[in-house]
Regions:
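A structural signal for multi-pass alpha-helical bundles of membrane permease subunits
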Residues: 6-11, 15-284
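N-terminal Lys/Arg-rich, disordered targeting/topogenic segments
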Residues: 1-5
Length: 284
């Protein structure tokens, strides 16, 4: 038997067309800045000043901007600093966040709800509003212009990851804990051998959110890391800005250089990323 074609009303057809046109339009809008950045990165300074931003460069093999951006902005050192900060912050955030989530989720004690509400309240506060107090604390502790101080500060402001772990842990049966306790396992062993492996999807989600935020952080890095040898990738791009104008061809080249490591990580770990985010979202 021949299958009947599904009949659509005029309103449904209009709605389908509208959805796809909107999807194409907003995708195009999102891609334009990236295309413009790539085009500008290959232009000479004279080309950039005399042509439209979407005008193609005369020479696609002009890598002078990339070399100059890498050398003048000391992007090699900046990349190392960014990686050190990001890796340390992610490790600290995972250890602190998962342990705190385990305690708040599995143990009922006076003040449990209050602590959760305080974390929620802290998440709602804009980070800029707390910078005066945070800066004073950082200054008094001698953490200004020290990578370890900046790392500690960034680890201490990770509230969203804690809530991701708590919400995911809500779906892990308590019976697993009870069975492990009957078998003689300690709370630490339950956390290390049971909870942490089961939290892998949530950890992937938290690492992506936190990692992108730390790698792209400009305000805090510029405030607490003012020495030249401590600059991160986000700060190094502002080497080409000044009161008399900005060298956007070099800035765009620097942007592409800074994006390459993230792109490589995404390509290598895309399977884990695609499997981790949906699982973390569903469980959360």
């Amino acid at each position: 038997m021949k299958k009947r074609r599904k009949q659509y009303s005029a309103g449904a057809i209009i709605w389908i067309i509208f959805k796809y046109v909107s999807l194409v339009f907003f995708s195009f809008v999102a891609v334009i800045p990236i295309i413009s950045c790539v085009i500008t990165a290959f232009k000479t300074e004279e080309e950039y000043k005399t042509t439209n931003v979407m005008t193609l460069p005369q020479n696609w093999f002009n890598f002078d901007n990339f070399v100059e951006a890498f050398q003048r902005a000391n992007m090699g050192r900046a990349f190392v600093n960014s990686v050190i900060v990001m890796v340390c912050v992610l490790i600290g955030a995972i250890i602190i966040g998962t342990q705190l989530a385990y305690v708040l989720n599995r143990f009922q004690f006076p003040g449990n709800g209050l602590i959760r509400n305080l974390f929620l309240f802290a998440a709602l506060l804009p980070g800029v509003a707390m910078q005066v107090t945070v800066y004073q604390i950082m200054h008094d502790l001698g953490f200004i212009n020290h990578l370890y101080g900046y790392i500690i500060m960034m680890m201490g402001t990770d509230v969203i990851s804690i809530y991701i772990f708590i919400q995911y842990m809500e779906n892990i049966p308590v019976s697993l804990d009870e069975s492990a306790i009957i078998d003689g396992a300690s709370y630490w062993k339950i956390y290390w051998k049971i909870m942490l492996p089961l939290l892998k999807p949530a950890i992937v989600t938290a690492c992506i959110l936190k990692g992108v935020g730390v790698y792209n952080e400009y305000y805090s890095a510029n405030l607490y890391l003012t020495k030249e040898n401590l600059k991160t990738m986000a700060i190094s791009l502002y080497t080409f800005t000044g009161p008399l104008g900005s060298q956007y061809n070099l800035i765009c080249a620097g942007v592409i250089i800074s994006l390459l490591p993230a792109l490589i990580v995404f390509i290598v770990f895309q399977k884990q990323i695609y499997s981790g985010i949906p699982a973390g979202a569903v469980k959360g």
